[in-house]
């Protein structure tokens, strides 16, 4: 009987909390992040272990480039649900952004944790595409002396190829573009277009022509082809 009474006493609060969450989520999707943050913070005061609320607050902090706050939210998520791959991926992402934008000497000490977070995401979810993209970016951006490796980037690109052909071609093209193998990158981006016809594939090829190969007319034609295809 007591449990029934407690349930009916708590029911209005539960409905209110869900209503507020829905409002916060709607504001987030509308990119009204400051307003959404206020709502999610109020929810967190009464429900400090609500995973989705914490994740939204982490996402908002990341968009605001408040790296320490975002790190704190994602770290809490890892503690509350240690087998969720995406929390490790997001944690590694904001930790990496803090490293890039902060003290370079401190950044060196963060590299292993960034890499380890992405690797953990893949270990928990072997089909995690975004974590592989993040590792590719990490390995091509880092100097060799602190762990950068083109061959390791290619390894993760090969893994992407098995999971998603378009991601495989785009990632290989990205690696080729980074190392100034523009003709090879062009081939990969064209393969991505052929199998997916995605906006991203067309945009990558157009950007390559315009920004790296000094062929603005080719870039224009690529974007026009995409526009005509969608029209």
Model region roles, listed by residue range:
Residues 50, 84, 128, 165-167, ...:
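Residue-level recognition of tetratricopeptide repeat
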Residues 47, 81, 118, 125, ...:
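A structural motif in tetratricopeptide-repeat
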Residues 52, 56-59, 90, 134, ...:
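Canonical tetratricopeptide repeat
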Residues 27, 61, 95, 102, ...:
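Residue at a conserved register position within TPR or TPR-like alpha-solenoid repeats
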Residues 30, 64, 98, 142, ...:
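Structural motif corresponding to the intra-repeat A-B loop/turn of tetratricopeptide repeats
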Residues 15-56, 62-63:
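N-terminal leader/linker segments that initiate helical-solenoid repeat arrays
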